[in-house]
């Protein structure tokens, strides 16, 4: 939303309104002035995605990381991934992490007719090749190649989850023909999502990292890695509060 809203009238999901109730409330905001809708779709069991597909009718599909949330209602991560891909059956384009073996295999099995923009940090033959990711103390420098053009931008994040999200957003911006210089400028000004690895300066040389918005083990692992990086650079003692 931050990357595209300067040029387009956008309607988006409020926070994570991604359920069978949240999605219709999000779509309800659409009006004749809207040029683009950004909606999150989440599932907790088999069969739910078809209902969300009928509501959203997406043309651009972005498949984010497949985590362990609600896994108790699925036999495997592959089953969950295949269920999520039903949302994209009528899309014009599907964007995903081409280095994720689970996602790549499921996309191949799903026989989608959509154009694929699979980004990769390993395979130079992928449509969007990420040639370098360099983490600094408080920002990350990312270089990429798309349609034989090389570019570089910075983001004010260093955690892996934010980097993966940014690469998905990069692919969407490129598909929508956002100029590279605008992408570079807006990436540098991205603001963090509230309560997701939110860093606040506390008292007595204390730094607070608020990740209360996430609740699964994969997110906790990312948050702990982020905590270690921040504390080591500043020489601080670490305390985890669950």
Segments (PLM) and residue ranges:
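Fold-independent oxyanion-binding glycine-rich loops
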Residues: 13-15, 41-42, 65-66, 91, ...
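A structural micro-motif
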Residues: 8, 92, 114-115, 128, ...
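Phosphate-binding loop of NTP-binding sites
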Residues: 1-98, 102-113, 176
């Amino acid at each position: 939303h931050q990357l595209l809203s300067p040029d387009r009238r956008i309607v988006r999901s409020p926070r994570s309104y991604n359920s069978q109730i949240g999605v219709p409330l999000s779509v309800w905001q659409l009006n004749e002035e809207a040029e683009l809708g950004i909606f999150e779709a989440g599932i907790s069991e088999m069969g739910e995605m078809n209902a969300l597909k009928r509501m959203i009718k997406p043309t651009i599909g972005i498949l984010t990381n497949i985590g362990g949330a609600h896994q108790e209602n699925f036999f495997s991560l592959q089953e969950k991934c295949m269920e999520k891909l039903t949302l994209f059956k009528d899309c014009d384009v599907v964007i995903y992490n081409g280095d994720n073996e689970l996602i790549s295999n499921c996309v191949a099995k799903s026989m989608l007719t959509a154009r694929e923009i699979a980004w990769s940090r390993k395979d130079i033959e992928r449509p969007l090749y990420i040639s370098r990711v360099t983490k600094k103390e408080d920002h990350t420098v990312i270089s990429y190649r798309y349609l034989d053009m090389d570019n570089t931008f910075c983001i004010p994040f260093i955690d892996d989850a934010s980097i993966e999200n940014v690469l998905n957003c990069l692919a969407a911006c490129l598909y929508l023909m956002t100029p590279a210089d605008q992408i570079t400028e807006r990436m540098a000004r991205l603001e963090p999502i509230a309560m997701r690895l939110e860093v606040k300066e506390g008292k007595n040389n204390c730094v607070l990292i608020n990740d209360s918005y996430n609740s699964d083990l994969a997110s906790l692992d990312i948050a702990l890695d982020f905590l270690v990086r921040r504390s080591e650079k500043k020489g601080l003692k670490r305390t985890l509060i669950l």
